[in-house]
Amino acid sequence: AYRVRGLALFALLAVMAGGPVHAPARRIALFRSAPETAAKRTAVDYLRTHTGPDETVLVWGAEPSVNFLSRRKSPSRYSFQYPLYTNGYRNAAAAAETFLAELSSRPPAVVIDTSATNLLVPPLDPASRRRRRLPSAFDPLPPAMGNLFDLLAARYRRVDGTGVLHWAVYRQAGR
């Protein structure tokens, strides 16, 4: 009975998604490129041009599709960082410690700050961070975030922005 219901649900979802269970190749191609908006494409193109395939890239915020589409690995298991700066998150301190250790052992060649288009993401730039009013779940930021901001400020310099998104781009100091 559960198997029949499961198959019926799968078929219903496939029809609702706009096509047969075995979608033609062109629909699959459209689905695959859907997250690649013009704005994200600018960031992806920047990374493909300015980083090597073996270099890691930290996309600060909640845009792991940029790592995926640029074929650049994240330096951390935290491909989106909401748990790091959410007050009351069960393991926020341990998560921040792990994140810092991962960034220290695998320093990203480039850091892209997506906070310009996501009000839930605290900006990496101190002046922008002071001006930003974060939602109550993120304000004040957990104390461990200060260590992260200090690490990034000591090791990275802003070099560019990524076009229409106005995402700040940081490179390792001295590179």
Residue ranges and their predicted role:
Residues 3-174:
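Extracytoplasmic
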